Regions:
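Catalytic cores of the polymerase beta-like nucleotidyltransferase superfamily
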Residues: 1-343
Length: 343
């Protein structure tokens, strides 16, 4: 309805049983609740269901799948009204919660009181706000109040770090990922996920205009933060993201120095392991340019410096390890000194 490209269809089946679908050749794939693959199209078909909260957390629900469950009852358990619009095979829209009206008014609104039962919806609301920001959508006040209540209840702490990262990663792939972090900050969720209550999204906002790689975007968000290690750990980011953000953080600190000398360059090379991780360093260095003022007084060509450093090989005339390392370091220092004097 928003003309946003979609790549799959999910079907809700009313008035049927698991046995009936299996008898028609559908293959069950869902464990928590029955989801089936169509024998030909491989599209997903789920039995209409009702849910009941049984405890705390994202997975503390029991499900009811009998034939009496209506489509409206199934849609009532959805998170937001624009996600609670169904379409039958003839193209007719079923919209019991005025989702089309909210589409027209560009509002992200919860469907019902059942919304508050699932803490994951805090992050989902933030992600939808990021995804739909470019279309002018905003989270309505009542829904924002509800996610603040979920945060205050403490249930957000029951979410696994893996699930938190899954939603965060999806947000990083949207056109306005900074909105995701602004929403979780505003509702108080950020400080429950990690040991900071604020994240500076300005560098992320600057990078997202040209950079679509989620790793680049994440690094722009966190590399300048003094709690980098704790943030990476709290969001359960992949190892590659951790490494790039940590290297970028070191480069940013280096670029903020008023002046640098040869030893500073070698020290940075040592800390970032340029010798074995050349590509990682160069990627992080490019990202760092989004995270530092343009008036940095350093004008170093890191592609040339890295190439220069790594072209220097250990002397074959020396046999003792310590002597080899010392000579290699001296050669690198001399080469960089010569390069700087000629630049």
């Amino acid at each position: 309805l928003l003309k946003i490209p979609f790549y799959e269809k999910d079907w809700v089946v009313v008035g049927a049983t698991k046995e009936e679908l299996i008898g028609k050749g559908y293959k069950q794939i869902g464990k928590e609740f029955p989801v089936f693959l169509h024998p030909e199209t491989k599209e997903e078909y789920a039995l209409a269901r009702k849910e009941r909260k049984t405890g705390t957390g994202h997975k503390a629900f029991s499900f009811e799948f009998d034939k009496s469950v209506s489509l409206e009852e199934d849609l009532e358990r959805r998170d937001i009204t624009i996600n609670a619009i169904a379409q039958d095979k003839k193209g007719n829209l079923i919209d019991p919660f005025k989702g089309q009206e909210d589409l027209k008014n560009k509002i992200i609104r919860r469907v019902s009181d059942a919304f508050k039962e699932d803490p994951l919806r805090v992050l989902r609301i933030a992600r939808f706000a990021a995804k739909l920001n470019g279309h002018g959508f905003k989270v309505d006040e009542d829904t924002m109040e509800e996610i603040q209540k979920i945060v205050s209840s403490g249930e957000l702490t029951t979410l696994s770090r893996e699930r938190i990262w899954m939603e965060t990663y999806k947000a990083l792939t949207t056109d306005n990922p900074e909105v995701y972090f602004q929403v979780i900050e505003e509702c108080g969720a950020l400080s429950q996920i990690c040991p900071v209550s604020q994240l500076d999204t300005s560098f992320l906002a600057k990078a997202m205009k040209t950079q679509t790689d989620p790793n680049v975007r994440w690094t722009c968000l966190v590399a300048s933060n003094s709690s980098l290690e704790d943030i990476n750990n709290s969001f359960n980011v992949p190892k590659e993201y951790v490494e790039i953000s940590e290297v970028c953080s070191l480069i940013i600190a280096f670029k903020k120095l008023d002046s640098v000398n040869v030893k500073d360059i070698i020290e940075l090379a040592d800390k970032t392991d340029i010798y074995r991780k050349e590509e990682r360093f160069l990627k992080a260095e490019k990202i760092s340019n989004f995270c530092i003022d343009n008036n940095s007084n350093q004008n170093l060509n890191w592609n040339e410096i890295v190439k220069l450093i790594n072209n220097i090989k250990a002397s074959s005339d020396l046999k003792e390890g310590k002597l080899i390392a010392k000579k290699l370091r001296e050669d690198r220092l001399n080469a960089i000194q010569l390069y700087l004097s000629e630049s």
